[in-house]
């Protein structure tokens, strides 16, 4: 499954490289001095445990279209009214019918937003910075080595974004730490097999280190 997601990124990355060559990459989102890009990790820490990251996903490969009756704005309003600390927004188009514009449509709710996609190239960090997102997802299994992850983390710091490094097992966790990850998200659903096991979070949590912010994702009702 991850190979399919990786292949689907080729067109987006090629488009961004053409824009870079032409000097036409999008400018960073223009926040006002008063209303700066909200802190993702800070919001989770302030909310305390358990802090909820509420996800907006229009469709999925396994379920197809989930809901077309509610707009991204409708969902953002309901999530905010019910106490979500942050939003996670699927922007991948080919398999999840996502769109970067969802981030703009949900920003009014004032919650820090995580761009959830299958990002591989630092130019996609630049693209994310042109939206009101506060953070982006980096899936460790998408990267060949720690240096590739480190390049993405460096780009995030340069553009004022936070990186959520997603892991499925001990090897992924070792890779994230070797690259300098500060926010670790344990996905209980293995994207290679789509099997869900809440025991993954319980097992890996034993390796949490001081100063790290950890998130458990998938399979939680």
PLM region spans:
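Conserved N-terminal beta1-alpha1 strand-loop-helix module at the mouth
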Residues: 1-113, 120-123, 155, 160-183, ...
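Structured beta->alpha junctions
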Residues: 91, 117, 218-220
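Hydrophobic, well-structured mid-protein blocks that either form specific transmembrane helices
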Residues: 106-157
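Catalytic alpha/beta core domains of metabolic enzymes, predominantly
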Residues: 198-201, 205, 212-221
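Generic beta-sheet signal
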Residues: 116, 139, 166, 186-187, ...
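Glycine-rich phosphate-binding active-site loops on the catalytic face of alpha/beta enzymes
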Residues: 85, 89, 130-145, 185-194
